[in-house]
Amino acid sequence: MELKILEKSDDEMKMEIAGESHTLLNMLKIILLEDERVHTASYDMKHVTISEPVLFIKTENADPIDVVKAAVAKLITECEEFVTVFNKAVE
């Protein structure tokens, strides 16, 4: 995975996340949209095998980098919770 910030302002950011697919981008988008500071969160992937996905976020009164950091932390927590529940279920 490689990440490149393509554009950044006080309330918008566009970043390319090379080597990833709809799986990660869709989960990240959903979590971003749950944050009240997020006005818009979307991603575009022109073609799954020849282009890299680009995530776009527009915030209200918040630095988009801070908002993405919070979303990633929440995603990690949700994955850890799933692992715990799954492991208990299969014991």
Curated annotation (Swiss-Prot):
Transmembrane spans: none
Entry keyword set: Cytoplasm, DNA-directed RNA polymerase, Nucleotidyltransferase, Transcription, Transferase
Keyword Ubl conjugation carried by entry: no
Any one GO CC term of the record: DNA-directed RNA polymerase complex
Coiled-coil regions, chain positions: none
One Pfam family hit: RNA_pol_L_2
Primary enzyme class: transferase
Biological-process GO terms, alphabetical: DNA-templated transcription
Record flagged with keyword Transferase: yes
Subcellular location: Cytoplasm
One GO molecular-function entry: protein dimerization activity
E.C. no: 2.7.7.6
SUPFAM superfamilies cross-referenced by the UniProt entry: RBP11-like subunits of RNA polymerase
Catalytic activity: RNA(n) + a ribonucleoside 5'-triphosphate = RNA(n+1) + diphosphate
Function: DNA-dependent RNA polymerase (RNAP) catalyzes the transcription of DNA into RNA using the four ribonucleoside triphosphates as substrates.
Record-stated family: Belongs to the archaeal Rpo11/eukaryotic RPB11/RPC19 RNA polymerase subunit family.
Subunit structure as annotated in this protein's UniProt entry: Part of the RNA polymerase complex.
Protein name: DNA-directed RNA polymerase subunit Rpo11
Species, as recorded: Methanococcoides burtonii (strain DSM 6242 / NBRC 107633 / OCM 468 / ACE-M)
Encoding gene (name): rpo11
